[in-house]
């Protein structure tokens, strides 16, 4: 930032500090305890839309909010007051305000209001309603009170925060000047409530599971590690809620879910944040086909509630979330996109050679035909799945917690839901055979010991729970942040997380 700009900001702050002191000496602030509002701005606008130009309605109203703009013209002034619901104009007439000030110790004069209150300040006012000759519904102010003095200027109201990084670092400024950002987080809150309500209405119970865990399991991801001092014990921030929710199914809860925060010590991008939100849902006596139906119904219902329709636009592309959605196996989609039939490859070497001839990368870490199939899918298919698509029947090597497919050897009963080229949900017919589960987790443990930091460990307590007996179960996980991105037409996950993790700011 240029030195002249810093100097100007410093001078402005000093001026506002002087105004705050002046208000304090007048007994009017500058930091109030409370204010009793009778209305919110949106209610006033809606309830008094019939007020004609030039008319007053002798109804006493009290509103509070932040001053967003101000115009002073001699003995008249016009302020724009914003609260969470909208804005309303304040009509300030010197004679009216001064008359009230002479009889009301809690209210200041017109001159005090117009010289000591700046854009950015929080104020509360009481007055009557008036429709100006230009048709603007206004509160004709009789009394006013400073509620909180702002010492920093607001961003330019016309240009907002042009610096995207600053919008994320100082979200409070972004929310002040951007109605779109406020609407994004309002929709997020409504969406989360709608998901919980949908599940609650269908007899699912939300039960909280530990964030701090002795063994990080339930996903292939690198965990954050911490330490419990009293127990002298290493602990992990959870990378999934899966294994504890399954324990609850073992314990007799037949429909259970948790919507909460997940932590993965991985990279950041427009699609990934190390701390994110998911909902995991488990239903006894169900399989992955049942979970597909549940996923369609849940997402389409919530979309209708939040967006008004199952047909929405994302980044200029029309998306139709009306069920039923397309269903296709991973093998079918890869063969359709590349011509490669992974079902016919005898071993990894043959599959790798075919991939190379098709122009696909062959990473060394993909050490089996199944892992190469997944690589081919990610490279050649994933981004093309714009309309909602259930991708079915994944390789067993990359799905250690999913049940083996009932009719396709080497595959599991698993689907992932893709919308606008992004994975949005993941579900299994859950693996309930404790012996099969132990073998797969031990194979994962071997991969971890060989250097794969994302591989699962062996959770002995979870395996013991499976030996007690778990009923057939369908499980589902939905990424809340990516769903919010879709429902708010947001290009980056940072746009829908109020305070995303960012790289340290470089100091100049």
From Swiss-Prot:
Principal subcellular localization: cytoplasm
Molecular function per GO: ATP binding; lysine-tRNA ligase activity; magnesium ion binding; tRNA binding
Record carries keyword Membrane: no
InterPro entries documented for this protein: Aa-tRNA-synt_II, aa-tRNA-synth_II, aa-tRNA-synth_II/BPL/LPL, Lys-tRNA-ligase_II, Lys-tRNA-ligase_II_N, Lys-tRNA-synth_II_C, NA-bd_OB-fold, NA-bd_OB_tRNA
Enzyme class: ligase
An example Gene Ontology biological process: lysyl-tRNA aminoacylation
UniProt cross-references to Gene3D superfamilies, sorted A to Z: Bira Bifunctional Protein, Domain 2, Nucleic acid-binding proteins
Required cofactor(s): Mg(2+)
GO CC aspect terms: cytosol
Subcellular location(s) per record: Cytoplasm
Catalyzed reaction equations: tRNA(Lys) + L-lysine + ATP = L-lysyl-tRNA(Lys) + AMP + diphosphate
Binding-site positions, Mg(2+) 2: 423
Cofactor note text: Binds 3 Mg(2+) ions per subunit.
Chain positions recorded as Mg(2+) 1 binding sites: 416, 423
E.C. numbers: 6.1.1.6
Keywords (A to Z) from UniProt: Aminoacyl-tRNA synthetase, ATP-binding, Cytoplasm, Ligase, Magnesium, Metal-binding, Nucleotide-binding, Protein biosynthesis
Subunit and interaction comment: Homodimer.
UniProt record similarity statement: Belongs to the class-II aminoacyl-tRNA synthetase family.
HAMAP family the record matches: Lys_tRNA_synth_class2
Protein's name according to its UniProt entry: Lysine--tRNA ligase
């Amino acid at each position: 930032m240029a030195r002249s700009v810093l100097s100007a900001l410093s001078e402005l702050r000093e001026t506002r500090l002087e105004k705050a002191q002046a208000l304090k000496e007048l007994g009017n602030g500058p930091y109030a305890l409370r204010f009793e509002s009778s209305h919110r701005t949106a209610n006033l606008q809606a309830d008094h839309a019939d007020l004609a130009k030039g008319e007053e309605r002798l109804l006493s109203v009290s509103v509070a909010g932040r001053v967003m703009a101000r115009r002073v013209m001699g003995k008249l002034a016009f302020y724009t007051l914003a609260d969470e619901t909208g804005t309303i104009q304040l009509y300030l007439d010197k004679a009216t305000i001064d008359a009230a000030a002479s009889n009301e110790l809690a209210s200041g004069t017109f001159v005090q209001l117009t010289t000591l209150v700046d854009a950015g300040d929080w104020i509360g006012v009481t007055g009557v309603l008036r429709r100006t000759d230009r048709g603007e519904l206004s509160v004709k102010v009789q009394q006013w009170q400073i509620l909180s003095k702002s010492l920093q200027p607001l961003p330019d109201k016309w240009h907002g925060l042009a610096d995207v990084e600053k919008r994320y670092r100082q979200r409070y400024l972004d929310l002040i000047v951007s109605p779109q950002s406020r609407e994004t987080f309002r929709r997020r809150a409504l969406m989360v409530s709608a998901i919980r309500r949908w599940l609650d209405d269908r007899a699912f119970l939300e039960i909280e599971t530990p964030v701090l865990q002795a063994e990080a399991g339930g996903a292939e991801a690198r965990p954050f590690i911490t330490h419990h001092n009293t127990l002298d014990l290493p602990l992990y921030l959870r990378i999934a809620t899966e294994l504890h929710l399954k324990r609850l199914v073992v314990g007799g809860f037949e429909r259970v879910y948790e919507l909460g925060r997940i932590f993965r010590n991985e990279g950041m991008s427009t699609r990934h944040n190390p701390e994110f939100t998911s909902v995991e849902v488990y239903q006894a006596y169900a399989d992955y086909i049942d979970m597909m139906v549940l996923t369609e119904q849940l997402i389409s219902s919530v979309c209708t509630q939040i967006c008004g329709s199952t047909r929405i636009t994302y980044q200029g592309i029309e998306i139709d979330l009306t069920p039923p959605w397309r269903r296709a196996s991973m093998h079918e989609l890869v063969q359709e996109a590349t011509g490669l039939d992974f079902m016919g490859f005898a071993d990894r070497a043959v599959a790798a050679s075919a991939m190379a001839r098709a122009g696909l990368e062959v990473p060394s870490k993909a050490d089996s035909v199944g892992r190469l199939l997944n690589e081919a899918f990610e490279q050649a298919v994933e981004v093309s799945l714009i309309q909602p698509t259930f991708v079915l029947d994944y390789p067993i090597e990359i799905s250690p917690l999913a049940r083996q497919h009932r009719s396709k050897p080497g595959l599991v009963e698993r689907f992932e839901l893709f919308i606008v080229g992004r994975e949005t949900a993941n579900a299994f017919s859950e693996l309930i055979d404790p012996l099969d589960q132990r073998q797969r987790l031990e194979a994962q443990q071997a991969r971890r010991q060989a250097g794969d930091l994302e591989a699962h460990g062996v959770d002995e307590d979870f395996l013991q729970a499976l030996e007690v007996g778990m009923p057939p179960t369908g499980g589902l996980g939905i990424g809340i942040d990516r769903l919010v991105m879709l429902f708010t037409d947001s290009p980056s996950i940072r746009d829908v997380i109020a305070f995303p993790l960012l790289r340290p700011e470089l100091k100049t």
